[in-house]
């Protein structure tokens, strides 16, 4: 149950505001595994003053979330740039290439920043563990093991 998961919680929070979260941001991402398959999800509160009809990065497969048999990822940040480079897909492709989750997250964010110059964060879960990376203030991450 949740008591077991909570007992294995690792908090990787960095760049938090005094309230424990970044002001005016409420995106939540999750990646999970049942031991055989991976699933990823990302939810966002949207963007103020967006153009009518804009489709953000969150609902786009490969951008806000992505999974293969090797693992999954969820990302948030500069939405148009995340969509342009399909950040979550990029992170999972690194897992497919055989590198670990933390290295996949680090490499994906390094490539993202090099290509776009923008800020983002990504969480990654693979068969060997979890990782996260970001290049912007206000990203909080936690890992729960059952």
Label the model's feature ranges.
Residues 1-146:
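N-terminal nucleophile
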């Amino acid at each position: 149950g949740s008591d077991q998961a909570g007992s294995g919680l690792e908090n990787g929070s960095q760049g938090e505001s005094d309230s424990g979260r970044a002001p005016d941001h409420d995106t939540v991402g999750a990646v999970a595994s049942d031991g055989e398959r991976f699933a990823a999800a990302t939810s966002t509160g949207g963007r103020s003053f967006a153009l009518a009809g804009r489709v953000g990065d969150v609902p786009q497969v490969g951008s806000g979330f992505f999974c293969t048999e090797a693992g999954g990822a969820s990302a948030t940040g500069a939405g148009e740039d995340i969509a342009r480079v399909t950040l979550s897909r990029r992170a999972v492709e690194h897992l497919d290439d055989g590198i670990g989750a933390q290295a996949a997250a680090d490499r994906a964010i390094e490539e993202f920043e090099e290509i776009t110059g923008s800020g983002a964060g990504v969480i990654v879960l693979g068969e060997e563990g979890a990782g996260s990376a970001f290049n912007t203030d206000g990203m909080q991450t936690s890992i729960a093991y059952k």
